[in-house]
Design a protein with these regions (language model features):
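Conserved nucleotide-sugar donor-interacting segment of glycosyltransferase catalytic cores
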Residues: 86-122
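Glycine-rich, highly charged phosphate/nucleotide-binding loops
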Residues: 49-68
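Short catalytic/ligand-binding loop motif for oxyanion handling, primarily in non-cytosolic enzymes
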Residues: 12-14, 36-39, 85-88, 114-119, ...
Length: 178
């Protein structure tokens, strides 16, 4: 089976790739290396701000274009959450649709923060989470920027698009079992 893993979350896709390769599958991992983890990847999408500055996003797109032969024609593609490429939300939506139409199945991994998760936590679901425990909201001031980022209209729309149009959702964190 030909598999593409897009994005990274604490070496989750890297570990998954190792297991799938041992089972005989052909796996390509495309990510930015998950920031400071700098995890191994086949297609490097890291933004080099020092070298390219504000043009670094174009370099990410160029790397994607140069690797279309690896990105298209997969049996399964799993994307890491809704922002799986280090670009703005609308670029992630465009790339999502391209991946969806050029591959057989696309799976969204629920591996990190997203607007839905924060909305549920604000309601107290589940009873314990990063931002809610002991019956009340916690760490709101510390998480204000993090939450504001995910509630930006472009990212909220991107989350809806990727979540509702994926063929399946895979939950990793206990918060997703709501």
């Amino acid at each position: 089976m030909k598999i593409l893993l897009v994005g990274e979350s604490s070496l989750l896709h890297n570990t998954l790739k190792k297991g799938l390769v041992e089972l005989g599958h052909q796996v390509t991992l495309m990510s930015d290396g998950n920031d400071w983890h700098n995890s191994p990847r086949d297609i490097d999408l890291r933004r080099n701000m020092e070298r390219y500055g504000r043009w670094s996003g174009l370099m990410v797109l160029w790397k994607i274009v140069c690797n279309l032969h690896k990105i298209c024609g997969n049996d399964i593609v799993q994307v890491h959450n809704y922002q799986f490429v280090p670009l703005m939300g609308w670029w992630n939506m465009l790339i999502f649709w391209f991946i969806k139409f050029t591959n057989k199945r696309i799976i969204k991994g629920c591996f990190a923060d997203d607007p839905h998760l924060f909305r549920q936590q604000a309601k107290g679901i589940p009873a314990y989470s990063d931002t809610f425990w002991n019956g009340k909201l916690q760490n709101i001031e510390e998480n204000k920027e993090r939450m504001a980022f995910h509630f930006m209209p472009q990212f909220d729309k991107c989350w809806h698009t990727v979540s509702y149009h994926s063929d399946a959702l895979i939950a990793c964190l206990y918060e997703y079992y709501l």
